[in-house]
């Protein structure tokens, strides 16, 4: 194993409370029916517009409006320290980095907010490459984010591990031909990880140190 690609939301950072709160505020601001927190949580990992269009029967223009409104609300509410890391994230990334693994992130989040989170959490020095939803033609679960990362490093799928908490992460990894690791402490469950046939399933990110 040479390269480990991480999802961000629900895998490295516990962003679920802020994301679902922002989604529910977006519904109210736009004047749409408010979905439940659990309904919102189930969509985490998809691009914003697709998220809103899956939650409600809205047209493309309203989907764009929801995505724009979400980003505006998120920018206000996302103060430094508003989002924390899951246990053992920092020390695990540090250990992997020291062992010589290349660490990358593939996220449905935009680059500006991701980099702000990484700086706030002091993780930027461990990450060699970032691919966001804006860098590819097709988002998760298509393989584009992983394919772009493999091309950047000139590394084969056989030497790569995709780590994420959502079925979209595992499906993306499978579609790109890399090994996959599902985490159970984020927004997905062990049952979901088993159902989408993750190669490995862990309850703590530190367990990766025993896999690679």
Enumerate the predicted regions with their spans:
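Short helix-capping segments at alpha-helix termini
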Residues: 28-33, 59-60, 98-99, 122-126, ...
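A metal-dependent, Asp-based hydrolase signature
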Residues: 45-77, 87-97
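Active-site neighborhood of HAD-like aspartate-dependent phosphohydrolases
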Residues: 1-42, 56
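Short, acidic loop-to-helix structural element flanking the phosphoryl-transfer center
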Residues: 76-105, 111-115, 143
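Asp-based, Mg2+/Mn2+-dependent phosphohydrolase catalytic module
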Residues: 1-2, 38, 94, 110-111, ...
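Short alpha-helical
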Residues: 18, 47-50, 61, 84, ...
């Amino acid at each position: 194993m040479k390269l480990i690609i991480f999802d961000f939301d629900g895998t490295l950072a516990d962003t679920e409370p802020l994301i679902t709160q922002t989604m529910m505020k977006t519904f109210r601001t736009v004047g749409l029916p408010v979905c439940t927190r659990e309904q919102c949580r189930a969509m985490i990992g998809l691009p914003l517009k697709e998220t809103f269009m899956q939650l409600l029967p809205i047209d493309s223009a309203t989907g764009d409006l929801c995505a724009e409104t979400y980003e505006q609300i998120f920018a206000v509410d996302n103060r430094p320290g508003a989002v924390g890391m899951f246990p053992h994230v920092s020390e695990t990334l540090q250990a992997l980095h020291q062992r010589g693994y290349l660490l990358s992130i593939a996220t449905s989040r935009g680059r500006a907010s991701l980099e702000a989170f990484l700086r706030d959490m002091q993780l930027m020095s461990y990450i060699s490459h970032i691919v966001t939803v804006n860098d590819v033609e097709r988002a998760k679960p298509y393989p584009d984010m992983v394919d772009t990362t493999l091309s950047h490093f000139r590394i084969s799928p056989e030497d790569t591990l995709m780590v994420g908490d959502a079925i979209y992460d595992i499906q993306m990894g499978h579609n790109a031909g890399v090994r996959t690791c599902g985490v159970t402490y984020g927004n997905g469950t062990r049952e979901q990880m088993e159902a989408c046939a993750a190669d490995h399933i862990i309850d703590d990110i530190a367990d990766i140190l025993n896999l690679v």
